[in-house]
Amino acid sequence: MNIQETIQTLREELNQHNYNYYVLDNATISDYDFDIKLKELQDLENKHPEFFDEDSPTQRVGGTVTKNFKTIAHQYRMYSLDNSYSKEDLIDWENRIQRVLGNVNLQYTCELKYDGASISISYQNGKLVQALTRGDGFQGDEVTNNIKTIKSIPLKLKGDYPERFDIRGEIILPFAGFEKMNQELIEIGETPYSNPRNTASGSLKLQDSAEVAKRPLECLLYTVAGNNLPFKTQFEGLESARKWGFKVPNEAKLVNSMQEVFDFIDYWDVHRHKLPYETDGVVIKVNSIHSQEELGYTAKSPRWAIAYKFKSEQASTKLKSISYQVGRTGAITPVANLEPVQLAGTIVKRASLHNADQIEKLDIRINDTVFVEKGGEIIPKIIAVDLEKRPENSEVTQYITHCPECETELVRNAGEANHYCPNFYGCPPQIIGRIQHYISRKAMDIEGLGGETVALLFKNGLVHNYADLYELKVEDILHLERMAQKSAENLVNGVEKSKEIPFESVLFALGIRFVGETVAKKLAKHYKNIDALSQASLMDLILVDEIGERIARSVIEFFENEENKIIIERLKKYGIQFETVERVNPNATEKFIGKTFVVSGVFSQFSRDELKKAIEDNGGKVGSSISAKTDFVVAGDNMGPAKLEKATKLNIPILSEDEFITKLNESE
């Protein structure tokens, strides 16, 4: 055997041992013997660099330093899941599905919901080429070098696999590894980590991949995304992923009814604490991929999947004090400061009290013993008071009447739960919060400028609103704490680059109350520019798709405010994009203007997205459900019987794929 063959044999042996241990949980070699073989391979590779292979087991130890993580678009969007908290919720979900599919017999895949950091890993020709964090679902941070250090993730695949696909999973930190890491920190006098989930998530963003390699992270895979995949069901997809070398949890189960879903939930609600890692629920997916395609997606989540959350854990502790926070819109949020208590794997020191009504409803008082619950919330909540332990001298909590930051008298609008500080342009947290919102990734996405720096700029009198950002010069900010020449230049350059951000994002960045990302996109698309929007009447706004009276009034109030008018004029002067830039499609026409289409089924010449784009490029609108307002239904193979029946009943023309293409190619 020559040197190259020896190296290749060692690599194959070590890869197989890694797979046996980290994926199959079956050690087939002692740690000592494994290390001896790994050292032998390292020595041979060092002596013969001409045989270097980036997928060698020796490259698992990391060593690459990443100073800035690139943000890259997901090829296939990473959706969130809708949550359910009762079996009744699941029955309602199944009923909604059946109304679309036509009361067919359904199978479901039940999988445990692991509490970690979501990841999307891309493979091409059997090799790992890229790994992205979830990010906002549309784009994520590239963490490929760090992901390659996790031994349960294959660098090369086994068997017969698609040429290109993405696989999604959860990066988790098992309890044993987490406890070992914390024990090592305690021994050297360092602060231990708070919980496995945050530690796993933070590990992905460490700059030195060698540090990531030291952490006992694992990856549990749960879905494959791609075109022309070699399976027709979710469960077959999991089995295929196992054959390719991925660690797919064995707990996943294929069931034939909602009752079997309930049985799965009941079993794991009792036995989940025996698992070596955190799980907070069950994910239920329609098993048939064809049915998944038929059901489609909402703006945020797949209609064919839902998460069932296990009931929250509770703990009791003492309420030490109540503090009040001011948000960017002036909303006051009371927060309970608690004696630290262990809850669901974390140390809890604070809990949300929501508003004055909640404090009054629970009759919460300082020094009370309270019951704290942690569900899906970032901050836990108080659910009850232990009245038997209440001190005799306790006093009823009086909700504050003035802003804790600027001392302005608070207001409470009719029908709203929150109190507000009306000092919109003079209250420091509101000013800072608005600027922080303006610079955020989904808004102006200003690189080199973070929330702490915004607070520092305000504290030093350099900014009082987001228009002031465009007046900043490097020499103005060099004297700030932790601000070097390069940092100052990056900040100013980031602000300058934000002038390229499109109108819909600018509109969201302005921070108009009730105008989120989706609403901002609709308004930008409808009005085309800021001047037309600012002059719109209440009735004009309400007529825009999905814009109700509450949003419309908020938009009008924003543009009627003199301070806002001044800020917008300044932003115009600085060159901010206040007009929609129409992207010209040379093949676009107006032949479908005023027509609404519903697309259903599976197509051979178009993907569903391509078909929808063809409709929109030619002036048409794509609806999600069939109604009297639908003009055409484009029906692919295996169109749902319920949709077919409804379209027929309403006498809506049903076009085959070929008929649609003919219609598309007709001259106007």
Curated annotation (Swiss-Prot):
GO terms for molecular function: DNA ligase (NAD+) activity; metal ion binding. The active site is at residue 113. Keywords: DNA damage, DNA repair, DNA replication, Ligase, Magnesium, Manganese, Metal-binding, NAD, Zinc. Its EC number is 6.5.1.2. The keyword Iron-sulfur does not apply. SMART domains: BRCT (SM00292), LIGANc (SM00532). Its cofactor is Mg(2+); Mn(2+). GO terms for biological process: DNA repair; DNA replication. Signal peptide: none annotated. The keyword Ligase applies. NAD(+) binds at residues 31-35, 80-81, 111, 134, 170, 285, 309. CDD domains: BRCT_DNA_ligase_like, LIGANc. PANTHER family: CHROMOSOME TRANSMISSION FIDELITY FACTOR 18, DNA LIGASE. This is DNA ligase.
